[in-house]
Regions:
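Hydrophobic h-region of N-terminal signal peptides that target proteins for export
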Residues: 9-18
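General helical structural elements
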Residues: 6-7, 119
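Intrinsically disordered, low-complexity segments enriched in polar/charged small residues
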Residues: 7-8, 267
């Protein structure tokens, strides 16, 4: 009888771990006529912005309409403001001294006007915080906050990587939290409510912790994870190949409260670098070939 009971418990446990978090309604390829990289989807899921090589930063809608927002061919770390009216990005440049400098800029999606938020610097941190239409950047460990719409600027938390350290800036103060000690931390992202940070520790996997480095929770093999709401993550799983050539990769949804996860793409597409809408119902991703896809989910 005890064996039967234990077997039933194990079966129920296995069923709960494989329970479905969402229903995949559609996985749609968006043919915009350009190759893109690392898309960022809007809060409402109606469009994405992405880097498109020589075309610069582009806006792409669900029907494939593609418009150039800014001629910034080397731009990276794209972020959208809450209202979807501006894209913030890092713009690198090389000067006559052969050193690399990075400035932080914003571009208005409607007017295409580009504004410099932080002048080119050798010490601009990789992370950016967005709160409404306020942008918080960190230069040489010091927070700099600006409003894009003339309203009072609101400072937000920022997570960034500094020589492999996981740095978190809260209330204008920056410190390395390195939750598991010295290592190589990458892919940090702060939750929408500003309470937690997800990151990848090379050789160890994906983790979530509080902004002070406490409360570490292991997520597993979830690469380049981003938030799909405050309690869920989506990232790359079952990655095969090399950094130069990915031969297989799927996307997996993970629920922090239950520990349940669900694969949301199949092996017909090499899905990488996801971005989720505010409610997690739409997830954009690209392939190594620069194809853009959007996954639509329902709970």
């Amino acid at each position: 009888m005890r064996k039967i009971f234990l077997t039933a418990v194990l079966m129920l446990g296995a069923m709960s771990m494989s329970a479905q978090l969402a229903t995949v309604q559609n996985v749609q390829r968006i043919d915009a006529g350009v190759s893109v990289d690392k898309p960022v989807i809007s809060a409402d899921g109606s469009f994405v912005v992405a880097q498109a090589g020589a075309k610069g930063i582009v806006k792409i809608t669900a029907d494939g309409t593609c418009t150039t927002v800014a001629k910034a061919s080397g731009a990276y770390n794209l972020r959208l403001t809450a209202d979807g009216q501006n894209v913030v990005f890092a713009a690198p440049e090389y000067r006559s001294n052969h050193l690399r400098y990075v400035s932080l800029k914003s571009a208005n999606l409607a007017t295409k006007s580009v504004r410099t938020l932080v002048k080119a610097s050798r010490r601009l941190n990789s992370g950016v915080g967005i709160e409404g239409n306020s942008v918080t950047a960190v230069e040489n460990g010091k927070a700099r906050v600006q409003s894009l719409d003339g309203t009072k600027a609101v400072r937000s938390a920022v997570a960034s990587i500094n020589y492999g350290h996981l740095d978190v800036t809260v209330n204008g103060k920056t410190r390395s939290i390195d939750p598991q000690g010295r290592g190589s931390y990458i892919w940090p992202s702060i939750s929408p409510d500003g309470q937690k940070v997800v990151y990848w520790l090379v050789g160890r996997g994906c983790f979530v912790c509080n902004l002070d480095g406490t409360g570490v929770q292991r997520v597993g093999e979830l690469r380049a994870a981003v938030w799909a709401g405050n309690d869920r993550l989506v990232g790359m799983d079952e990655v095969e190949g090399t950094a130069q050539q990915v031969t297989a990769s799927s996307l997996r949804l993970y629920d922090l409260a239950s520990g349940v996860s669900q694969t949301i793409t199949d092996d017909t597409v090499k899905a990488q670098f996801p971005s989720a809408s505010a409610d997690g119902s739409r997830i954009a991703f690209t392939t190594p070939e620069g194809e853009l896809y959007i996954v639509t989910l329902t709970k």
